[in-house]
Amino acid sequence: MADSRETLTINAFVVGYPIKHSRSPIIHSYWLKKFGIAGSYTAVEVSPDDFPKFIATLKEGKPGAAVGGNATIPHKEAAYRLADHPDALAEELGAANTIWMEEGKLHATNTDGYGFVSNLDERHPGWDKTQRAVVFGAGGASRAVIQSLRDRDVAEIHVVNRTVERARELADRFGPRVFSHPQAALQEVMHGAGLFVNTTSLGMNGTEAPHLDFSHLAANAVVTDIVYVPLKTPILNMAQEQGIATVDGLGMLLHQAKPGFRRWFGRIPEVDETLRSLIIADMEKH
């Protein structure tokens, strides 16, 4: 007998402004097809002014309405604020990227940190044996990274930023194992670190990045970048040229999608090489 989840059309979405760049529909459509689920996952462009109305309509729960979806830039903070039940992860970050209706209430979580560490687990197993990590950048994208590293019990998380005040705010937010430094201290801070994470936009869409010397990192260190366009960012290229292991940022996008799919469609999807190749092919077209 068919699973009852598969006899009804289940609808989910990704909402952002703009949204045409989103590759989330490719990811979820791949999984829907793989499981043979009668469902849809569509990109919806909604301006910040119209977002509260969008959420209010979702909460009405009319027949055929979406069961939930992803919120991306610039709606993550608003998705958290408008949720009836944000979980502890979203609460601490002040942002949600995954929302769903349950018993008439809107629930919210943030899966960015899960995506980040799952990518490292897949592409560089054992990375979390390090006791010292360097997070380069203190913007919004760094929060989930810092949270996930702390929750994986990395002993020291050093946040380096051009304006040290931003880094200090994150150290205050995420606790005593997080330390703040100005960009001038980067080389010194890297000494003995087993993980270097770029959370800045340096190298995004082919822009140049300043030269970084990774020679002070630990012998078995890994450098990763949450930027995935281009796949091999200037920072990853620099690390490879210096003989350092690297992990690109694409897996973070793929893995962060898994909890939402499970929540909306009731199946646990896998990130495989076919899916990865689909996204890379789409990146090469645009």
Curated annotation (Swiss-Prot):
It comes from the Bacteria. It is an enzyme of class 1 (oxidoreductase). Keywords: Amino-acid biosynthesis, Aromatic amino acid biosynthesis, NADP, Oxidoreductase. Its EC number is 1.1.1.25. Shikimate binds at residues 22-24, 72, 97, 112, 228. Pathway: Metabolic intermediate biosynthesis; chorismate biosynthesis; chorismate from D-erythrose 4-phosphate and phosphoenolpyruvate: step 4/7. The active site is at 76 (proton acceptor). GO terms for molecular function: NADP binding; shikimate 3-dehydrogenase (NADP+) activity. NADP(+) binds at residues 137-141, 161-166, 226, 249. GO terms for cellular component: cytosol. Pfam families: SDH_C, Shikimate_DH, Shikimate_dh_N. Belongs to the shikimate dehydrogenase family. NCBIfam families: aroE, PRK00258.1-4. Involved in the biosynthesis of the chorismate, which leads to the biosynthesis of aromatic amino acids. Catalyzes the reversible NADPH linked reduction of 3-dehydroshikimate (DHSA) to yield shikimate (SA). PANTHER family: BIFUNCTIONAL 3-DEHYDROQUINATE DEHYDRATASE_SHIKIMATE DEHYDROGENASE, CHLOROPLASTIC, SHIKIMATE DEHYDROGENASE. Homodimer. This is Shikimate dehydrogenase (NADP(+)). It comes from Agrobacterium fabrum (strain C58 / ATCC 33970) (Agrobacterium tumefaciens (strain C58)). The lineage of its organism: Bacteria, Pseudomonadati, Pseudomonadota, Alphaproteobacteria, Hyphomicrobiales.
